[in-house]
Regions:
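Small-residue-biased structural context
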Residues: 1-193
C-alpha cells in the first residue's frame, strides 16, 4: 500500500505542472491573447476539484487532524499556516472561476481579475507545496507510527471513493494532462496508481 506522504507528494508534482500550464496561459493573455472562458473554467475546476477538494481535503480531514491529535497546534505553526494558505488559495480559485463562469465577451475588469488572481495564486501554491514537502511532511513522517500510516492510507482510499467518487481521481489526472498539453507541456505526467 502506498505511503500517505508519498501519495500527497505525487499529487504535488501534478499540481505544480498544472500551475506551470496556468502560468503559460496567463503569460499569453498578458501578451494579448483573448481570454477563453472555457479554458479558464477548466483550470479553475481542476484547481478546485483536485488541488483543493481532493488534495487539501486529504490533508485537512486526515493528515492534519492526526498531527493535531499528536500535539501539533492547529491555530499556528506549520499546520496553522498551511490551513491559512489553503483558505487564501480558495479565494483566488473562486475569483479565477468567476471569470470562467461569466458570459459574453470578457470585460477589461475580468481580464485584470484573472491576471491578478492567477499571478498571486501560482507563487502562493508553489511556495506552499515547498513548505509542505520540506518542512511539514518530514515532521509528519517522523511523528507518524506505522499504524498511523496504514490507517491513513486506508482513510485516503475511502476519501477518494466516498468524497471524490469512483474513478474521479483518474478523470482529474486526464484533465491535468489536457491542461498541460494545451499549454506546451509535452512530458508525460508521473503515472498515478
Amino acid at each position: 500500500m502506498s505511503q500517505p506522504i508519498d501519495i500527497l507528494m505525487e499529487e504535488h508534482r501534478v499540481i505544480e505542472r498544472v500551475l506551470d500550464a496556468l502560468e503559460g496561459y496567463v503569460t499569453r493573455v498578458e501578451h494579448g491573447e483573448t481570454v477563453d472562458r472555457g479554458r479558464v473554467a477548466e483550470f479553475a475546476a481542476f484547481l478546485r476539484d483536485f488541488a483543493d477538494t481532493c488534495h487539501h481535503g486529504k490533508e485537512e480531514e486526515i493528515l492534519f487532524k492526526r498531527l493535531v491529535e499528536l500535539g501539533f497546534p492547529r491555530e499556528h505553526g506549520p499546520v496553522g499556516m498551511m490551513l491559512f494558505e489553503h483558505g487564501l488559495g480558495r479565494e483566488h480559485v473562486a475569483a479565477i472561476g468567476a471569470v470562467g463562469q461569466g458570459s459574453g465577451p470578457v470585460t477589461p475588469q475580468e481580464r485584470q481579475s484573472l491576471l491578478k488572481h492567477a499571478r498571486e495564486y501560482v507563487p502562493l501554491l508553489r511556495q506552499h507545496i515547498l513548505k509542505e514537502d520540506r518542512v511539514l511532511y518530514p515532521m509528519a513522517a517522523q511523528r507518524l507510527s506505522a499504524e498511523d500510516r496504514d490507517r491513513m492510507a486506508k482513510a485516503f482510499e475511502a476519501f477518494e471513493r466516498d468524497v471524490m467518487g469512483e474513478g474521479r481521481h483518474h478523470a482529474l489526472h486526464e484533465q491535468a494532462h489536457r491542461l498541460m498539453a494545451a499549454d506546451g507541456e509535452t512530458r508525460p505526467a508521473p503515472h498515478h496508481h
